[in-house]
């Protein structure tokens, strides 16, 4: 049933019948093109972050269920890898159309399970959709290379081939975007894919599977399993799985990279961040303050590219009171409420950790100029809400600076020169993203050239590249050789075969008859 034909609650209920059990709200698996109930005895309750009411129960899939997903993917690879690249491209054409037409329903599910505002949830879907759109150019992206006449009568050419069964392990903060970073690139290159969405937000992935079926993707090309630590270990250890993509925390990312790597798998692992925004006194003040507030507090700060650290250079520190006032005016509420700027964080545990890191800053000497920890939201008193929070007079040895807070908290530092700002950022172990706000081109150029961070914005607070490029976080924020999506994404999901062939000119058959007098030479 096409999602586009369904509206409101009717759509939500219809979808639930597809991937959940209506009487007891339990999320299903997706194996061999079908939504399947798990036989597990272990379940994880998924709570609405705005109310903490249980939305659904997510299974910890059994060993047999995970094995069946791998077998399905292994079987499908035999035919899918031999499917015309034009046929694989057609699936992406259809999928991008279906996602675009059902963006609103996907966003509603994301807001319900993850908590972010509806506008932000639509952005979540859109940034994933852009990867699908880029996959539609696979006929160019997957081209090989040729050198004719590398020697007498000899040609060399190379072409890219799929790896086999691949897997993706997804985080909670982007329920649609991150799965769409993974399985579309993998399967368009001819692989099959097993996706493990975060047990906190599986709904968007399940809806995408329904759309993938409608797009005509054959059974087994993508399978979805659920679970926590055991599911991760299964993916890392199973010998059939050739490559693993991960986005999430430092601890999990390092663990997956090392464990899967020991088992001979390719791994790409996007991990933690501490993204700095450098504010020069010559910047456009109004635009800069608006961008700072949006990048720091949007999505309740639960973005790997959130601008969580502001570095004010010279007289720019005089702008801090104005920034505080902008942050104070942001509306905190449930994500589905119109006009909401900041929704809840994902869980009570996340809220507690955020509050503790803020308190650690205060104890270590930072000034709490805006405190959102005690905010109460009418009609949602049980929600996981933290309002915009700003700490000033922060130093680089404080825990609130050294650790990724992952909440609506901005820590502010001051320096005298752009050189000091560059040194500070380069000394931080993370390298996901950074930005500078200035109207001076020479300052911007110096910053771009000297900064050791993978993604740099100039008057752009969250410099996440579009999919014709790649997501190029570096240093402590990434482990692996090839980044997500773009040309590097295609390289990650393919292997190169190089052929050197020799065909002697003298061996050509059916040549023109020779009628000249034989000379015996």
From Swiss-Prot:
Reaction catalyzed = 2-methyl-3-oxopropanoate + NAD(+) + CoA + H2O = propanoyl-CoA + hydrogencarbonate + NADH + H(+); 3-oxopropanoate + NAD(+) + CoA + H2O = hydrogencarbonate + acetyl-CoA + NADH + H(+)
**Top-level taxon of origin:** Eukaryota
- EC numbers for this chain: 1.2.1.27
Cited InterPro entries: Ald_DH/histidinol_DH, Ald_DH_C, Ald_DH_CS_CYS, Ald_DH_N, Aldehyde_DH_dom, MeMal-semiAld_DH
Q: GO molecular function of the protein, one example?
A: methylmalonate-semialdehyde dehydrogenase (acylating, NAD) activity
First-level EC class: oxidoreductase
Q: Where does NAD(+) bind?
A: 172, 196, 199-200, 249, 404
This protein's UniProt keywords: Mitochondrion, NAD, Oxidoreductase, Transit peptide
Annotated catalytic residues: 304
| Gene Ontology cellular component list | mitochondrion
User: Biological process (GO) annotations?
Assistant: thymine catabolic process; thymine metabolic process; valine catabolic process; valine metabolic process
Query: What Pfam families does its record include?
Result: Aldedh
Localisation: Mitochondrion
Q: What is its main location?
A: mitochondrion
As for family, the record states: Belongs to the aldehyde dehydrogenase family.
Tell me, in a sentence or two, what this protein's role is: Probable malonate and methylmalonate semialdehyde dehydrogenase involved in the catabolism of valine, thymine, and compounds catabolized by way of beta-alanine, including uracil and cytidine.
Cite the record's note on assembly.
Homotetramer.
Name of the protein:
Probable methylmalonate-semialdehyde/malonate-semialdehyde dehydrogenase [acylating], mitochondrial
Q: Which organism is it from?
A: Aedes aegypti
Q: What is the lineage of its organism?
A: Eukaryota, Metazoa, Ecdysozoa, Arthropoda, Hexapoda
């Amino acid at each position: 049933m096409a999602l586009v034909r369904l509206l409101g609650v009717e759509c939500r209920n219809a979808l639930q019948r597809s991937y959940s059990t209506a009487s007891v709200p339990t999320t299903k698996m997706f194996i061999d093109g079908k939504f399947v109930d798990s036989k597990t005895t272990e379940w994880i309750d998924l709570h609405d972050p705005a109310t903490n009411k249980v939305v659904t129960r997510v299974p910890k899939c059994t060993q047999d269920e995970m094995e069946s997903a791998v077998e399905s993917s292994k079987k499908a690879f035999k035919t899918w890898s031999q499917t015309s690249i034009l046929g694989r491209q057609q699936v992406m054409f259809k999928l991008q159309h279906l996602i675009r037409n059902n963006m609103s329903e996907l966003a509603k599910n994301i807001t319900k399970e993850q908590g972010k505002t509806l506008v932000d949830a639509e952005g979540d879907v859109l940034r994933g959709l852009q990867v699908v759109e880029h996959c539609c150019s696979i006929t160019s992206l997957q081209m090989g290379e040729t050198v004719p006449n590398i020697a007498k009568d000899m040609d060399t050419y190379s072409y890219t081939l799929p790896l086999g069964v691949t897997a993706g392990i997804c985080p909670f903060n982007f329920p649609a975007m991150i799965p769409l970073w993974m399985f579309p690139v993998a399967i368009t290159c001819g692989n099959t894919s097993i996706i493990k969405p975060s047990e906190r937000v599986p709904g968007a992935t399940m809806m995408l599977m329904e759309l993938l079926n409608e797009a005509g993707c054959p059974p087994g090309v993508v399978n979805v399993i659920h679970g926590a630590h055991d599911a991760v270990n299964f993916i890392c250890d199973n010998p059939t799985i050739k490559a693993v993509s991960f986005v999430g925390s430092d601890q999990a990312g390092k663990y997956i990279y090392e464990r899967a790597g020991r088992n001979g798998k390719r791994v790409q692992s996007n991990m933690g961040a501490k993204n700095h925004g450098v504010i020069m006194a010559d910047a456009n003040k109004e635009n800069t303050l608006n961008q700072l507030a949006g990048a720091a507090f949007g999505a309740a700060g639960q973005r790997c590219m959130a601008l969580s650290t502001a570095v004010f250079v010279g007289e720019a520190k005089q702008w801090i009171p104005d920034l505080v006032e902008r942050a104070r005016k942001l509306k905190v509420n449930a994500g589905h409420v119109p006009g909401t700027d900041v929704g809840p964080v994902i869980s009570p545990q996340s809220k507690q950790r955020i509050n503790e890191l803020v308190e650690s800053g205060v104890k270590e000497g930072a000034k709490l100029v805006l405190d959102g920890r005690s905010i109460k939201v009418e009609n949602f008193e049980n929600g996981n809400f933290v309002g915009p929070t700003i700490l000033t007079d922060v130093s680089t040895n404080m825990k609130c600076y050294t650790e990724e807070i992952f909440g609506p908290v901005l820590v502010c530092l001051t320096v005298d020169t752009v050189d000091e700002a560059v040194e500070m950022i380069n000394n931080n172990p993370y390298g996901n993203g950074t930005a500078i706000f200035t109207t001076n081109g020479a300052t911007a150029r110096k910053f771009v050239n000297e900064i050791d961070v993978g993604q740099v914005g100039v008057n752009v607070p969250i410099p996440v590249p579009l999919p014709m490029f790649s997501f190029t976080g570096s240093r402590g924020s990434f482990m692996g050789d090839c980044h997500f999506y773009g040309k590097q994404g295609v390289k990650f999901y393919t292997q190169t075969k190089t052929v050197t062939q020799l065909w002697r000119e003298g061996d050509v058959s059916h040549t023109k008859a020779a009628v000249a007098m034989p000379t015996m030479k």
